[in-house]
Amino acid sequence: MLKSLCKKALPKSLWVYHTNTGACNGCDIEVIDVLTPYYDAERFGIKLVGSPRHADVLLISGPVTRQILPALKRLYEAVPDPKIVFAVGACACGGGIWKKTYNVIGGVDNVLPVNFYIPGCPPRPEAILHGVAVALGLIKKGVKPEDYHELSLEEMFPPEE
């Protein structure tokens, strides 16, 4: 179903609107790197746009903070259907290091439906391009997804015998 959504939404190129919902800007720097001539994302038809009304894709970095929540919902509604959401970076994927703080709601998927996750802190430009290329069907995914669960302290540091 998602592949047909991508084909319908992205017949020729991918118009992306990027927003930061409360991150440290590490992911933003990597997203900007993807657009430089060194990585040349435009060769894949990826173009950054200045308005969500022109976008096919919403690229979100950072954890969702309480202050940004109403604006993020309005932003999501402004993107025309069919819309695709990418969560970029550990904070957008699950809240990151700020997950349990007083002003953070968590990852983007706590608020909006997320179609694709690109983890990393920050994710390298190659990882961002790879994630988008997999989403577009330009390349096949070489790894199988694993169920994510937070490790307990006992799992991270087993007691010595």
Residue ranges: model-predicted function:
Residues M1-R53, E77-K83, V104-I105, D109-I118, ...:
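Iron-sulfur (Fe-S) cluster-binding modules
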Residues G22, P63-T65, C91-C93, P123:
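Short glycine-rich anion-binding loops that position phosphate/pyrophosphate groups of nucleotides
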Residues V57-L58, R66-I68:
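A contiguous binding-surface segment within folded domains or other stable secondary-structure elements
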Residues Q67-P80:
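Amphipathic helical hotspot of TIR/SEFIR-family domains
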Residues L69-A71, G96-W98, I128-L129:
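Short glycine-/acidic-enriched loop or helix-start segments at secondary-structure transitions
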Residues V85-A87:
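Structural beta-sheet core signal
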Residues C93-D109:
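Glycine-rich, charge-decorated loop segments at or immediately adjacent to ligand/cofactor-binding or catalytic sites
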